[in-house]
Every structure is written in structure tokens, then in C-alpha cells.
UniProtKB/Swiss-Prot annotation:
PANTHER family: ARAC-FAMILY TRANSCRIPTIONAL REGULATOR, TRANSCRIPTIONAL REGULATORY PROTEIN. Residues 228-249, 277-300 bind DNA. The keyword Flavoprotein does not apply. Transcriptional activator of the rhizobactin regulon. One of its GO terms (molecular function) is sequence-specific DNA binding. Keywords: Activator, DNA-binding, Ion transport, Iron, Iron transport, Plasmid, Transcription, Transcription regulation, Transport. This is Transcriptional activator RhrA. Residues 210-310 form the HTH araC/xylS-type domain. Gene3D superfamilies: Homeodomain-like. It comes from the Bacteria.
Amino acid sequence: METIRPLKFGTLSLPDRESRLVCRSILLDMLGEATIAPDEGDLTGVTGLFWKYVSLSLATVYFPRTMLRVNASGMGDSGVVILRAMDSPLVIRHRRIKVEAARADVIFLPSDASSEITLPEGGRFDCAHLPAYALASKRDLLKPIMMQPLAAECLPLQLLTNYAGYLLRQEYQSEEHAGMMVAHFYDLLPVLAQDIGNVSPRETPHNRMASIKMRVEQNLANGSFSITDVAEAERITPRAIQKFFSREGTTFSRYVLGRRLSLAKSLILAEGEATSISQIAYNVGFNDLSYFNRTFRSRYGVRPSDLRRLAAAA
């Protein structure tokens, strides 16, 4: 089975010319041809991480802590680029529109036209490219949140960036596992659009199931959340909801359990020893720790504590 792993690029001793070549090659398939102009000094010592899957590309670049501009030509496809600066505000000029985002806030940007990206204080720059074909069923959904700053405090956005961070930090992933994580990444886009863009679920493709899954995602931490809660919110019967999930070869309860276990696994891998296993279990809606441990081991073939230990040793 093919193994997918992030690429660590650059070193603190890498000279300016080589740093520029590395940055160009990394950003080429995300922003198009890009020229980087620091206000002072050069790009000596740039480092970062790059991860690529067939339907998602991710990069984190650690630029010098000085004002710099990135002039990007854009891509040939009509996909979406997600941008974030962690050490600086972010200023973007795109098609005569200027957008400013605070430190750690996020901007969704069309990838098919040139842009000028300014980091007044330089530092860490995060970028994701979502190709057009992967967004086919979600393009209209994203329109209300394009080209506006999205606050870092938004919970669906935090989940989205946590998935991206996990993919960039995890040393080894099977193609199957990477595909599952990317699918979850895309599943969060309707949730984000609903939370920020105030998009009615009935305006989106596959509206009912997308709305149901959105409600599940928003209530994973609620241990008492049930199919009855969804039925009341959607104004349909629990039986109708079960029919929707039956068409996907599962049940409501199995879907919720799978999402909770998947989120728990991501948090275990991403947070290291910062949060206890029991707290993670409760945070994703499990009220019984022994049940969590049992179902987690049944699904992934390893106990949560052993997974954390293996990840730390990798």
C-alpha cells in the first residue's frame, strides 16, 4: 500500500537563491508562478512543510520576520485557495478587491486569477489548494464565504485547520487513511458555510443529507445528542433520517460513532500529551470511557493510549 508523507523543506542555512527555488516549486501548484519580495534582507533560511494528495495540497512556509509580498499568477483551474498568516496580518488584492485579515484569520480565495499577498510582519504562512474537480458539488455553497476574513474562533474553521495540521505533521499515512482524512476535510466545508455564510441547507446540493450531517458535526461533543434531536430540527421523522443513511450503507448511530472516533483519533495524533485520552473522549461526545476504548480499538486495531505512544515514537 502506498505511503503518503509530508515533505520537510529548507534549512536555516539554505541560501537565498536555493530558498527561492524551493518556495517557487512548493507554491507553483497552489498559487501558480509566485515571486516573493521581502522588504528587508532575503529568503535565506526559509523552512516549511508540504503535503499533497490527489484532491488537496497543503503547505506551511516559515518566512523571515519582515514585511514581504507574494505576487502569484493564479492557477489554470477554477479551484479555491485557503490562506492564513499566523505571525502577521494578511492583506490580499485580487481582481481589484482588497481584503485584510487579522493574525490567524482565514481567507478563501479563487485560484484562477493573479493575486498580491502581503504579510506586513512576515512569519508563518499557511496555504491550501482545493482543485476545481474536487469542489464540483460544493462550489455554489462556498460563494458566500469567498474573499472575506473568517475569524479564527469559528469552531468549524478550527476543525478544518486541525485536519490540515494533522496531515502536515503526521509522518506516515497510508493512501486509504489520507483519503479518509481528505474526505472529512471536504465534509466540513458545508458546516463552515452554514456557520459563517448563513446559507440555507435547502439552497445547497443534496440539501437534506448535507443539513443532517452538518447538525451531527455541530453536536459531536454533546453526549446526549440523538436522532430525535435531528428529526425535530429538520422537521422530519427519525425513520426518514434512517432511510437517508441506509442509502449510504450505514445507520445514523454508526455514522455518528464513526465521526466521533475519527475526530478523537485526529485529536490524539495532533495534541500529543497536551490533553488526556479521557478528556478527548468526553470532548467528542463519549460518556463512557470504557466504551470509547473498546470501540476505538475495534475500529482502528489499537488502543487510544498505544496510538498516542506510537505516534510520539515515530
